[in-house]
Curated annotation (Swiss-Prot):
Disulfide bonds: none annotated. Residues 58-73 have a biased composition (Low complexity). Residues 89-102 have a biased composition (Basic and acidic residues). Belongs to the EF-1-beta/EF-1-delta family. GO terms for molecular function: translation elongation factor activity. This is Putative elongation factor 1-delta-like protein. The lineage of its organism: Eukaryota, Metazoa, Chordata, Craniata, Vertebrata. Keywords: Elongation factor, Protein biosynthesis. Residues 58-77, 89-133 are annotated as: Disordered.
Length: 133
């Protein structure tokens, strides 16, 4: 008699529908799925790499003979800006790499506190004090 109330319940027979609905709800609340964002990130990285390859070609073509001095031909500010961004990017990458390498060690490479000093009562110092006395 206690199991008769489950006869009218269909939630367990349609659990996959509720599971799919719940998954869609949380995906909408939290944003896109991680797999899609990884794919988008790889496409963006591919586009950046292609743009980096095309920048020197484009600049070499604009600095060549017959380059106009108009708005489309004056790329000096753009060249300076790109160079500064590249330097900043390399510096940031180097800093992040240093932080990632230092993280397992538990200290920063620039932190002088990680250098171990001999305690004041080191055996070498005690021997020098006893030999004088």
């Amino acid at each position: 008699m206690a199991t008769n109330f489950l006869v009218g319940e269909k939630i367990w027979f349609h659990k996959f529908k509720y599971g799919d609905a719940e998954r869609r709800f949380y995906e909408q609340m939290n944003g896109p799925v991680a797999g899609a964002s990884l794919q988008e990130a790889s496409m963006i990285l591919h586009d950046i790499a292609r743009a980096r390859e095309n920048i020197p070609k484009s600049l070499a073509g604009s600095l060549g003979p017959g380059a106009s001095s108009g708005p489309s031909g004056d790329h000096s500010e753009l060249v300076v800006r790109i160079a500064s961004l590249e330097v900043d990017n390399q510096r940031d990458l180097a800093e992040r790499a240093g932080e990632e390498l230092a993280r397992p060690l538990g200290h920063s490479p620039a932190d002088p506190a990680h250098v171990s000093h001999a305690p004041s009562g080191a055996p070498g110092q005690e021997a020098s004090h006893t030999s004088r006395g």
